[in-house]
């Protein structure tokens, strides 16, 4: 995930070297988010405030390489002191364009660096904006979506209706043209000593530090009275006059520092006093005064933004509070699941809209069959949702491993709709299966976590799961987001089915409560760690279930294989008597997933067979399930949700168990041997 860090010192004298060090330290605190290049933008050699130019330094690779590059800049005097200065810094995780210096951030508006911007997120309509700007004579040098933002603000500035237009007004007009998710921080030679930041769908917070009293603890949110529909329209209205009652500043126009970051870990060493921006907030700092405004007012808007105190210690923030990316990603699932649904599920009207599919919805509804194709964890997400897709779409659903699908030369027809699931969007077998289906005239749908990937480009339409970059090789949050994306597709397909409305409403209510239920499951981490202490010396492990939880068993067993190097097998409980029962004895650890769903009675039969062979089952069950717990060696009790979503809650204990087993066995959780995050060869 891209990392944003920016630093403004107002009436706080700092040398260029000190500013560099602050920016680099901020980026180092964001390294755990993952990145492939880094860059900074600072004021040029002339220290007169009104005559500055912007100097960019960017480097592919680690922040350390950028740090070394900064000190090679012969044209910059590191001893020059700035009383007021604004510097921005960025770590980039490539989404549009390969990792290189040109594609790195900050991105610039032109060769004179009139405007520079750093960006975390994805602009989905950047191609249309780029085409428009190119038609106006603006030349692009990178492949990024972010450069479109830099060029767009230059276009708005060049076509301004008045010379006294404010920096925040320019940004306001720009973001009204943007679609997608973003956190943005802008710097400009036309507005020296000023900063503007905004966000929509990506996190951004502002830290404030001053040894003087601050003007307020609650920053009022200001509004304009008009809305600009496109970049050519002119808004005649103005914001309320900025004064001590509408801005945050040090009383008496004294010294103050502001820190902008996508993560609190980059700020905490400087201050624990922060303001969390909300979606569509525009925060501007000018003359040491911070103001926040929004374009549109809604009834649910909070009228102010409070300064909050971070409850965090510096030593906690390496890789956030986590020892490994995988652990971090497991604990991010309340947020990643919410992000997958955000803007797509309307819980008030019980409607679902997947914007990437809406133009093809009629064609999809006319199809005769759905084919869902993936590898590894992505395949398991397809298995997990097959039953609910069949129920909601009333269509036959085939779930295929991409390699096997190709080996069989599976018949595919023009009235099929084929889904291709891949976290990276580059999985070789899945990509080959996509091309195979396209050649046969099927409609193709991509479900990926990477905008601009091969699968997202080559499919006819698709769903971006919005889970955020997943760095750990063993997939966790991508699985649950893929799961939810497929469920949302089924809900969208069944919207006009009167007979399914009660079921749809039940599932949508379940989706709404999922983030909180996931937090409840994550609170079992200590209990699962204690279980891992008993199991980590074992050589083999069986995971059994059926119905909606069969995929949970497959995925849980895969996680254990991937990072603990223990043999583990996910078994359909209905197949127990057809071979696997021979493995059961008092030494073999057996995990059983038994939930209060239509398969409950059949799972009880399997449980009896295991205990009859002196097996000691570890049971994942519902909180109110006293029947299963009677026969359990140990139980992990989970909150109950609608049956087709229970697999999201039941897989998380297995993710946590695999993590703790790997740590106890002394293995690198994030980089298991012989495995890569993105499998780009057959």
Curated annotation (Swiss-Prot):
A biological process term (GO) from this entry: fructose 6-phosphate metabolic process
Reaction(s) catalysed by this chain's protein: D-fructose 6-phosphate + L-glutamine = D-glucosamine 6-phosphate + L-glutamate
Record flagged with keyword Phosphoprotein: yes
EC number: 2.6.1.16
GO molecular function: carbohydrate derivative binding; glutamine-fructose-6-phosphate transaminase (isomerizing) activity
The keyword Transport is assigned to this record: no
CDD domains (UniProt xref): GFAT, SIS_GlmS_GlmD_1, SIS_GlmS_GlmD_2
Pathway info: Nucleotide-sugar biosynthesis; UDP-N-acetyl-alpha-D-glucosamine biosynthesis; alpha-D-glucosamine 6-phosphate from D-fructose 6-phosphate: step 1/1
Segments forming domain SIS: 360-499, 531-672
Matching InterPro entries: GATase_2_dom (IPR017932), GFAT (IPR005855), GFAT_N (IPR047084), GlmS/AgaS_SIS (IPR035466), GlmS/FrlB_SIS (IPR035490), Ntn_hydrolases_N (IPR029055), SIS_dom (IPR001347), SIS_dom_sf (IPR046348)
Active site (UniProt): 2
Enzyme class: transferase
Binding site for substrate: 377-378, 422-424, 427, 578
Keywords noted in UniProt: Aminotransferase, Glutamine amidotransferase, Phosphoprotein, Repeat, Transferase
Modified residues annotated as Phosphoserine in this record: 244
Domain Glutamine amidotransferase type-2: 2-288
Main function: Controls the flux of glucose into the hexosamine pathway. Most likely involved in regulating the availability of precursors for N- and O-linked glycosylation of proteins.
Cited PANTHER family: GLUCOSAMINE--FRUCTOSE-6-PHOSPHATE AMINOTRANSFERASE, ISOMERIZING, GLUTAMINE--FRUCTOSE-6-PHOSPHATE AMINOTRANSFERASE [ISOMERIZING] 2
Protein name according to UniProt: Glutamine--fructose-6-phosphate aminotransferase [isomerizing] 2
Species: Rattus norvegicus
């Amino acid at each position: 995930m891209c990392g944003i860090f920016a630093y403004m010192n107002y009436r706080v004298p700092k040398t260029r070297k000190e500013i560099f060090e602050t920016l680099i330290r901020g980026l180092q605190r964001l390294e755990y988010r993952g990145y492939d290049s880094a860059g900074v933008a600072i004021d040029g050699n002339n220290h007169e405030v009104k005559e500055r130019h912007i100097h960019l330094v960017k480097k592919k690779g680690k922040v350390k390489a950028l740090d070394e590059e900064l000190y090679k800049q012969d044209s910059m005097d590191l001893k020059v002191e700035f009383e007021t200065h604004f510097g921005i810094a960025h770590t980039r995780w490539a989404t549009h364009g390969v990792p290189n210096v040109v594609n790195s951030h900050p991105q610039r508006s032109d060769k004179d660096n009139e405007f520079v911007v750093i960006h975390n997120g994805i602009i989905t309509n950047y191609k249309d904006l780029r085409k428009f700007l190119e038609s106006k004579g603006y030349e692009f040098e990178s492949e990024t979506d972010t450069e479109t933002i830099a060029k767009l603000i230059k276009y708005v500035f060049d076509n301004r209706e008045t010379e006294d237009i404010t920096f925040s007004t320019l940004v306001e007009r720009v973001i009204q043209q943007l679609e997608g998710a973003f956190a943005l921080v802008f710097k400009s030679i036309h507005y020296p000593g000023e900063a503007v930041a905004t966000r929509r769908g990506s996190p951004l917070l502002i830290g404030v530090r001053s040894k003087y009293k601050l003007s307020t603890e609650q920053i009022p949110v200001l509004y304009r009275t008009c809305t600009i529909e496109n970049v050519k329209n002119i808004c005649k209205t103005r914001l309320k006059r900025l004064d001590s009652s509408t801005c945050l500043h040090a009383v008496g126009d004294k010294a103050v520092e502001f820190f902008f970051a996508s993560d609190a870990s980059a700020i905490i060493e400087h201050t624990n006093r922060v303001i969390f921006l909300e979606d569509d907030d525009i925060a501007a700092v000018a003359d040491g005064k911070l103001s926040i405004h929004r374009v549109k007012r809604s009834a649910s808007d909070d009228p102010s933004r409070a300064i909050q105190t971070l409850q965090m210690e510096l030593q906690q923030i390496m890789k956030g509070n986590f020892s490994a990316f995988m652990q971090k990603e497991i604990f991010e699932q309340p947020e990643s699941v919410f992000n997958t649904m955000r803007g797509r599920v309307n819980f008030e009207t019980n409607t679902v809209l997947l914007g990437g599919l809406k133009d093809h919805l009629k064609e999809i509804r006319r199809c005769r069959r759905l084919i869902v194709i993936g590898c590894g964890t992505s395949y398991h997400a397809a298995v997990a949702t097959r039953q609910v897709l069949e129920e909601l779409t009333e269509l036959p659903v085939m779930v295929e491993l991409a390699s096997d699908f190709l080996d069989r030369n599976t018949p595919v027809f023009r009235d099929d709709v084929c889904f291709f699931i891949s976290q990276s969007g580059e999985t070789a077998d899945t990509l080959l299966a996509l091309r195979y289906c396209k050649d046969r005239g099927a409609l193709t749908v991509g479900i990926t976590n990477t905008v601009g990937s091969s699968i997202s480009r080559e499919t006819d339409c698709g769903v971006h799961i919005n889970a955020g970059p997943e760095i750990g090789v063993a997939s966790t949050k991508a699985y649950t987001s893929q799961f939810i994306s497929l469920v949302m597709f089924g809900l969208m397909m069944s919207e006009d089915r009167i007979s399914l409305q009660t079921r749809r409403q039940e599932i949508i209510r379940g989706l709404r409560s999922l983030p909180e239920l996931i937090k409840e499951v994550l609170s079992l981490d200590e209990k699962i760690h204690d279980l891992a202490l008993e199991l980590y010396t074992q050589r083999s492990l069986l995971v059994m279930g059926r119905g909606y939880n069969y995929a949970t068993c497959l995925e849980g067993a895969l996680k254990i294989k991937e990072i603990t190097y223990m043999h583990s097998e996910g078994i359909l409980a209905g197949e127990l008597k057809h071979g696997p029962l021979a493995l059961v004895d008092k030494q073999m650890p057996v995990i059983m997933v038994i939930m209060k769903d239509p398969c409950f009675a059949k799972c009880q039969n399997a449980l009896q067979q295991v205990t009859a062979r002196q097996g000691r089952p570890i049971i994942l069950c519902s909180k109110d399930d006293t029947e299963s717990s009677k026969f359990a060696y140990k139980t992990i009790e989970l909150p109950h949700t609608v049956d087709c979503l229970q697999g999201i809650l039941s897989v998380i204990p297995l993710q946590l168990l695999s993590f703790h087993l790997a740590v106890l066995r002394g293995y690198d959780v994030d980089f298991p041997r012989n495995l890569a995050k993105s499998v780009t060869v057959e």
